[in-house]
Regions:
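Glycine/tryptophan-enriched, flexible segments
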Residues: 14-201, 310, 314-367, 383-384
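Conserved structured core elements
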Residues: 93, 122, 133-140, 156-160, ...
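Contiguous, well-ordered alpha-helical segments that form the cores/surfaces of helical PPI scaffolds
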Residues: 126-130, 170, 214-215, 224-234, ...
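Active/binding-pocket-proximal capping segment
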Residues: 183, 189-194, 245-289
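Hydrophobic/aromatic-rich core segments of domains that either
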Residues: 281-303, 311
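Glycine-rich, charge-decorated loop segments at or immediately adjacent to ligand/cofactor-binding or catalytic sites
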Residues: 3-15
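Active-site-adjacent structural elements in folded domains
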Residues: 112-115, 124-127, 193-200, 207-219, ...
C-alpha cells in the first residue's frame, strides 16, 4: 500500500472506513503521509539460504507454464502488438526502468491528466499497474520519484493525478479488508439483491445467458468499443481504465449478466490482476456497493474517446474502412456505404447483441464517465 495501515486515520479493523472514495481520500491526505521507501539492502547484508544452487537447477520457460491450450500460449505477452500497448517485461529492473522513463526521461507524467483517458499506445498512462500488482515496484517508490520530479521540474495536476490513482489503489485494499468476502458475493457489499439495491422496481436476479457472455469474452458483441477492448485483453492481458469501465457496464448493466463472471474473466486474463482492485471495481461497476451506479452509453463513449476510430480499427480489422461517423454504431451505415467499407453488419461484423429491456437506475447512473467501473478492477486502483 501507499499508506501503511497503522498510519491511516481509521480504526485498526477499518470498520469505520468510508465506503466512498472521496471521504477516504480527504481523510488520508489530510492526516496521513506515505512512509519513505525502504532502501535496498547492501551487498552481503543478508545471508544466503542453504542449498541456494538447488533453486536454480530448473529454469522454466513460457512453454513450461500450465496454459490450457496453444491459443492461450500464443498470447502470453503483448509483444505482437507493440503499437497497441506497451510490451511488458517482468521484474524489478523493468519496473524501475518504466518509472524512470515515464517520470524523468519522457516527462510524460507532466501531461498525464490530459492523456489518461487514452486507449491506444504505450504512453497515455504510466502502465505501472502490472509491476505494482506483482510487487515489482512499491507505490511508495513511485510517489517518492513523483515528488522528487515535482520539486526539481514541475508540479501540476498531472503529477498529483498519478498519486491520486495510487490512493484509489489503497482505497480498494482497505475496502476489501473491511468487507471481506462480501466483495465476491452476487449481492455485493451493500447486502441487498439486485432488485433492491441498484434498480427501480425490483428488476430481479442476474440473467443466465451463455451466448451473451461468450460474445463479450470473444469481442463479438456488435458494440465496437466493447469488442475492441475485449480483443485487446485477450491478445495482450491489458486494457485501459476507460475500456474497463465500458466493458463492465455493458456486461452487468446492459446485458444484465452476473458481474462476477466478468470479474472472474479479468482475473484470468489481466497482467495487472489485483484481487482487491479487480473485485472491488467490479462490485462497484455492477451497482452492488450501495453507491452511485455508473451506466455508460457505449456509443457516446466511443465518440468522446475514440472519435476517429483509431483504437477500434486497430483491434477490429473488419471495421478498418468504416467511416469515422459510423464507427460507434456500424449498423447505422447505409447499404452502399457498408458495401464500400467491405463491412456488412451481420455478415462481416456481428450485429449488436440483443439486450434485455432497458432498466432504470435508482442512483442517477449516467452515460459518461463518473465511476471507475471495470478497470477500477479492473479500472482504477492499478496505478495506471
Amino acid at each position: 500500500t501507499l499508506y501503511h495501515k497503522d498510519d491511516i486515520p481509521f480504526s485498526s479493523d477499518v470498520s469505520d472506513l468510508p465506503d466512498g472514495f472521496t471521504p477516504f481520500r480527504n481523510k488520508v491526505e489530510n492526516k496521513s503521509e506515505p512512509r519513505e521507501p525502504v532502501p535496498p539492502p547492501s551487498k552481503g547484508a543478508l545471508p544466503m539460504p542453504a542449498n541456494m544452487s538447488d533453486a536454480f537447477a530448473f529454469e522454466p520457460t513460457v512453454a513450461d507454464l500450465p496454459f490450457a491450450n496453444e491459443e492461450e500460449r500464443s498470447v502470453a505477452g503483448a509483444g505482437a502488438h507493440p503499437d497497441g500497448v506497451l510490451p511488458f517485461e517482468g521484474g524489478e529492473s523493468a519496473a524501475l526502468a518504466r518509472v524512470r522513463y515515464y517520470v524523468w526521461e519522457s516527462e510524460k507524467i507532466a501531461t498525464y491528466f490530459e492523456t489518461r483517458n487514452g486507449m491506444l499506445g504505450g504512453d497515455y498512462s504510466s502502465k505501472l499497474a502490472p509491476w505494482l500488482a506483482h510487487g515489482c515496484v512499491s507505490p511508495r517508490t513511485v510517489v517518492a520519484e513523483v515528488r522528487k520530479f515535482e520539486s526539481q521540474r514541475v508540479e501540476n495536476k498531472s503529477t498529483y493525478w498519478l498519486i491520486f490513482e495510487l490512493i484509489w489503489r489503497d482505497f480498494f485494499k482497505f475496502f476489501a479488508l473491511k468487507h471481506g468476502d462480501a466483495i465476491f458475493r452476487s449481492e455485493g457489499t451493500a447486502g441487498g439483491s439486485m432488485g433492491g439495491s441498484g434498480y427501480k422496481g425490483g428488476a430481479g436476479p442476474w440473467r443466465d445467458d451463455p451466448a451473451a457472455l461468450a460474445a463479450w469474452k470473444a469481442g463479438k458483441t456488435g458494440y465496437p468499443l466493447v469488442d475492441a477492448n475485449m480483443r485487446e485483453l485477450a491478445a495482450t492481458g491489458f486494457m485501459s481504465n476507460r475500456g474497463r469501465q465500458n466493458v463492465a457496464s455493458w456486461l452487468a448493466l446492459d446485458a444484465g449478466l452476473d458481474w462476477r463472471l466478468g470479474a472472474e474473466w479479468f482475473e484470468n486474463k489481466l497482467l495487472d490482476y489485483d484481487c482487491s482492485a479487480n473485485w472491488g471495481n467490479w462490485v462497484a461497476a455492477a451497482g452492488m456497493t450501495g453507491g452511485r451506479v455508473n451506466k455508460f452509453n457505449i456509443a457516446k463513449q466511443t465518440k468522446d474517446y475514440d472519435p476517429e476510430g483509431a483504437y477500434v480499427k486497430y483491434w477490429i480489422p473488419e471495421l478498418k474502412d468504416v467511416p469515422a461517423k459510423f464507427i460507434a454504431e456500424p449498423r447505422q451505415m447505409p447499404g452502399d456505404v457498408a458495401q464500400k467499407a467491405h463491412c456488412v453488419v451481420g455478415v462481416d461484423y456481428p450485429a449488436p447483441f440483443k439486450l434485455p429491456p432497458r432498466r432504470e437506475f435508482s442512483s442517477g447512473g449516467r452515460g459518461g464517465g463518473g465511476g471507475r467501473g471495470g478497470g477500477r478492477g479492473g479500472g482504477r486502483g492499478g496505478g495506471r
